[in-house]
A protein has these predicted regions:
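Mid-chain, well-packed structural core segment of small domains
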Residues: 58-88
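C-terminal end-helix/capping segment
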Residues: 90-92
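Short S/T/G/P-rich N-terminal loop/turn motif that feeds into the first structured element of a domain
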Residues: 1-55, 64-74, 94-118
């Protein structure tokens, strides 16, 4: 079971690039499905948020093993796609995330460091 994730979030689509952004989104879904099929990631979940007045309009949460996702982040194709997405949406971000058992392990590490410092 996955212990780590990549949170890929984005904001408003760049004006005039709406069609391109939709095409890139659909292509990205196929890309993630291919990564899942190859075993490079465990799963992914695209999410589109309701209008809420904030900057975050959607995200994809990719789940997998920390080492595999670390390799993915420096993969040239992943980098190319991230750069391309950043040209059609605002506020694109890729952030590592603890998920599943990783949350418990992260909290244990946090507690240990807290205990050492207090």
């Amino acid at each position: 079971m996955a212990d780590y994730g990549l949170f890929i979030g984005w904001g408003q689509v760049t004006r005039g690039r709406e069609k391109t952004a939709l095409d890139e989104f659909n292509d990205g879904i196929q890309y993630y499905a291919g990564l899942q099929e190859k075993g490079d990631i465990e799963s992914f979940e695209p999410v589109i948020l309701e209008q809420h007045g904030g900057d975050l309009l959607g995200f994809v949460l990719i789940r997998g093993e920390r080492e595999k996702l670390a390799r993915l982040r420096i993969d040239r194709e992943f980098e190319r796609r991230t750069i391309r997405a950043g040209l059609v949406v605002n506020s694109l971000g890729v952030v590592g995330a603890l998920v599943g058992q990783g949350v418990s392990e992260g909290l244990v590490t946090y507690q240990q460091q807290l205990d050492e410092l207090t």
